[in-house]
Amino acid sequence: MQRLCAYVLIHVLALAACSEASWKPGFQLQDASSGPGANRGKEPHELDRLGPASHHRRQLGLQGPPHLVADLAKKQGPWMEEEEEAYGWMDFGRRSAEEGDQRP
């Protein structure tokens, strides 16, 4: 009996996870047809009427892709430092040119 309950529970959870995207089809279609910049200039209460979007998705819709790309371009992560350390030894051509410029 416990095994049957476990199977039913797993099946219900899997079904709920697979059908999560299909329980809001109206908002998905409206969002796709409106385009990325269509929510620009709308009031927050108007955005609430459009559908149950997440806070993050609303921010992306209001901000627009060009701003998002610019913000991501400004950020530098720790991987930049790792690349400098890993490939710094291969940068001998630039370093020797800089050393040549410093000598009188």
Curated annotation (Swiss-Prot):
Q: Which residues carry this modification: Phosphoserine?
A: 96
User: What keywords does the record list, in alphabetical order?
Assistant: Amidation, Cleavage on pair of basic residues, Hormone, Phosphoprotein, Pyrrolidone carboxylic acid, Secreted, Signal, Sulfation
Modification Pyrrolidone carboxylic acid occurs at: 59, 76
Pfam families (UniProt xref): Gastrin (PF00918)
GO MF terms listed in the record are: hormone activity
Q: Where is this region: Disordered?
A: 27-67
Q: Does the keyword Phosphoprotein apply?
A: yes
Q: What does this protein do?
A: Gastrin stimulates the stomach mucosa to produce and secrete hydrochloric acid and the pancreas to secrete its digestive enzymes. It also stimulates smooth muscle contraction and increases blood circulation and water secretion in the stomach and intestine.
Q: Would you tell me the protein name for this molecule?
A: Gastrin
Organism annotation: Sus scrofa
What gene is it encoded by?
A: GAST
